[in-house]
């Protein structure tokens, strides 16, 4: 079986070429060809000796996930469904803004966590994505979006906020992050790459030590009682532990704050008392808040908070001195908005089956 070189960051690629008896600079050449030029085969790499290209063709490959579907929203948001084999597909989303282009990348086929308000969580879980399948999403998006009139890449920011919990696929995510940041890869700044987590505390500490990019935490509740219900991981790592981990992360973080993501669920977590509890909860954590109006999906059981409740909630936080943004709903007409990504998941957890039985029972 041929080795997929897309699975390697520069360090891994250098080791691979050393094993082939080649000098380290070959790794940099090949990395630039793959990620900066978008090369899909070794014959395109004209500055490599023919003998090396022949050897690479025999022993290795550049295997990129195949494109299954591409959609474009009325607001310019783009969504791609990529084939990762055995009937599974993952989604990646490009969100254009006036000052940046952000790509939202998936890390797993489905998600092993069961956040109750998330469409991906309802799909169950199949497996972790390889580093090649993660970075392949950025490869595809760069190819599709091209460059600006100034010859700059359209994609300037990456957020690991697609399907899956990135921290649960730690090693492959870190390899992909390394490629994103490498000057021979995509050359992104650590400040422009964000990893989102539901609160896997040990992995947050590991990421701080090996790849401290910007961090977003899917908080969604101001107390353990509510968070236990909607983010079951909280039962393992309750809010006190999570806040302490956030403080530790900031020691090495590229930004001097944590972004707390907070989906606004009508009657669940959107009252004024919840906002005041939040202020108390994050007292010792430099942070900003990103309030996310819930994006409905079929049979979710939740409703989006009213605009008035969101406004009051935001105002309470702002009056306490916090930077607060209310996320614009983007791409919801193609199910590309936050919490709507589902892809195609061959579920190994029977979670899809469980939810179908619950819905049948409710209808009966």
From Swiss-Prot:
- Give residue ranges for domain Radical SAM core: 97-333
Q: Which residues form the active site?
A: 91, 338
Q: Which cofactor does it need?
A: [4Fe-4S] cluster
Q: Which InterPro entries match?
A: Aldolase_TIM (IPR013785), Methyltransferase_A (IPR040072), RlmN_N (IPR048641), RNA_MTrfase_RlmN (IPR027492), rRNA_lsu_MTrfase_RlmN/Cfr (IPR004383), rSAM (IPR007197)
Pfam families, per the entry: Radical_SAM (PF04055), RlmN_N (PF21016)
Residues annotated as binding S-adenosyl-L-methionine are 164-165, 196, 218-220, 295
EC code(s) of this entry: 2.1.1.192
Q: What does this protein do?
A: Specifically methylates position 2 of adenine 2503 in 23S rRNA and position 2 of adenine 37 in tRNAs. m2A2503 modification seems to play a crucial role in the proofreading step occurring at the peptidyl transferase center and thus would serve to optimize ribosomal fidelity.
Single biological process term from Gene Ontology: tRNA methylation
Cofactor binding summary note: Binds 1 [4Fe-4S] cluster. The cluster is coordinated with 3 cysteines and an exchangeable S-adenosyl-L-methionine.
The positions annotated for binding [4Fe-4S] cluster are: 111, 115, 118
Catalytic activity annotation? adenosine(2503) in 23S rRNA + 2 reduced [2Fe-2S]-[ferredoxin] + 2 S-adenosyl-L-methionine = 2-methyladenosine(2503) in 23S rRNA + 5'-deoxyadenosine + L-methionine + 2 oxidized [2Fe-2S]-[ferredoxin] + S-adenosyl-L-homocysteine; adenosine(37) in tRNA + 2 reduced [2Fe-2S]-[ferredoxin] + 2 S-adenosyl-L-methionine = 2-methyladenosine(37) in tRNA + 5'-deoxyadenosine + L-methionine + 2 oxidized [2Fe-2S]-[ferredoxin] + S-adenosyl-L-homocysteine
**Protein encoded by which gene:** rlmN
Further facts: Reaction proceeds by a ping-pong mechanism involving intermediate methylation of a conserved cysteine residue.
Family membership, please give it.
Answer: Belongs to the radical SAM superfamily. RlmN family.
Q: Can you say what this protein is called?
A: Dual-specificity RNA methyltransferase RlmN
Q: What class of enzyme is it?
A: transferase
Q: Does the keyword NAD apply?
A: no
Cystine crosslinks: 104-338
Q: Which UniProt keywords apply?
A: 4Fe-4S, Cytoplasm, Disulfide bond, Iron, Iron-sulfur, Metal-binding, Methyltransferase, rRNA processing, S-adenosyl-L-methionine, Transferase, tRNA processing
The stretch of residues making up the signal peptide is: none
Q: Name one GO cellular component term.
A: cytoplasm
Question: Where, subcellularly, is it found?
Answer: Cytoplasm
Domain of life per record: Bacteria
Q: What is its main location?
A: cytoplasm
> Would I find DNA damage among this entry's keywords?
no
């Amino acid at each position: 079986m041929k080795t997929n070189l897309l699975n390697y960051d520069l360090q891994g690629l250098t080791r691979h070429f050393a094993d082939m008896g080649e000098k380290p600079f070959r790794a940099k050449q090949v990395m630039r060809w793959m990620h900066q030029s978008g090369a899909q085969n070794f014959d395109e790499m004209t500055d490599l000796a023919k003998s090396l290209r022949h050897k690479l063709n025999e022993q290795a490959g550049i295997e990129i996930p195949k494109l299954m579907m591409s959609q474009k929203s009325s607001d310019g948001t783009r969504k791609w469904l990529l084939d990762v084999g055995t009937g599974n597909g993952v989604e990646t989303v490009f969100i254009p803004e006036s000052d940046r282009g952000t790509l939202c990348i998936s890390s797993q086929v489905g998600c092993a966590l069961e956040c109750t308000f998330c469409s991906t969580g309802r799909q169950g879980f199949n497996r972790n994505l390889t580093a090649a399948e993660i970075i392949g999403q950025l490869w595809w998006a760069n190819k599709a979006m091209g460059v600006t009139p100034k010859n700059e890449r359209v994609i300037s920011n990456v957020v690991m906020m697609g399907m899956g919990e990135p921290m649960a696929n730690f090693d492959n995510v870190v390899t992909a992050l390394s490629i994103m940041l490498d000057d021979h890869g995509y050359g992104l700044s650590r400040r422009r790459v964000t990893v989102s987590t539901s609160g896997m505390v040990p992995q947050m500490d590991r990421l701080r030590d090996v790849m401290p990019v910007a961090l977003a935490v899917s908080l969604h509740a101001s107390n353990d009682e509510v968070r236990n219900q909607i983010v079951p991981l909280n039962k393992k790592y309750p809010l006190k532990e999570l806040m302490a981990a956030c403080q530790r992360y900031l020691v090495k973080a590229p930004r001097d704050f944590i972004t707390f993501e907070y989906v606004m669920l009508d009657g669940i977590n959107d009252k004024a008392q919840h906002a005041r509890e939040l202020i108390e909860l994050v007292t010792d954590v430099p942070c900003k808040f990103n309030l996310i109006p819930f994006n409905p999906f079929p049979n979710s059981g939740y409703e989006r908070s009213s605009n008035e409740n969101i406004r009051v909630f935001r105002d309470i936080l702002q009056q306490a001195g916090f930077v607060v943004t209310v996320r614009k709903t983007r791409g919801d007409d193609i199910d590309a908005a936050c919490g709507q990504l589902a892809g195609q998941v061959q579920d190994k957890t029977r979670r899809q089956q469980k939810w179908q039985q619950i819905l049948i029972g409710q209808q009966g």
